[in-house]
Amino acid sequence: KLTKHKNGLSSKKKIIGQLIITVITFVFIWKYGLINPRIDFSIVNPILKNSYFYITPVLFFVFMAVVIIGSSNAVNLTDGLDGLVTGPIIIVCFTLAIITYLTGHIEYAKYLNLNYVVDSGEMVVFLVAIIGASIGFLWYNFYPAQVFMGDTGSLTLGGLLAIVVIFIKQELLLPVTGFIFIVEALS
């Protein structure tokens, strides 16, 4: 027999789950040689070309944890109760789809001074699928709402955005494109 719990998961269990996702992502990046200890500032500040600094793998893991946990919780706070996060998610995914496409082509990446990431163009399909799912969600979320996103949707979307920017090595782009998430989290 299933019992109903009105409280859901505690915040401690949610953070532990997010740390598990961070560990899985780090192991995947490490195993496939995608780890890049170079944090690039050139997309955030295009005036200073080749502005970056190196960090150790342990600090990179801590940085990844901050990006993934911070992003997923900021998106969750932006969501509120009625799917308010869907509009910003569509905008951020569209922006990331363009940047991901550009990082997947060596000529564009070199011309725009971006890190070239082999086969990152495949993630464009994933980001466009998130856009399509979000538009479909909006259709059923208008009054009277038939579908609610909840923590499951908003935490997942925030984590997925973080993982995409980590894979394309543009971690500092997320605060720029998702500025609304930061403002909402700080309010």
Predicted regions and their residues:
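Membrane-water interface regions at transmembrane-helix termini and the short interhelical loops
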Residues: 1-2, 71-78
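Membrane-interfacial loop-to-helix junctions in multi-pass inner-membrane proteins
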Residues: 2-17
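Catalytic tyrosine of NAD(P)H-dependent dehydrogenase/reductases that use a Tyr as the general acid/base
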Residues: 14, 75, 147
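Non-catalytic accessory segments adjacent to catalytic cores
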Residues: 20-24
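Alpha-helical transmembrane segments
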Residues: 25-46, 59, 63-64, 68-72, ...
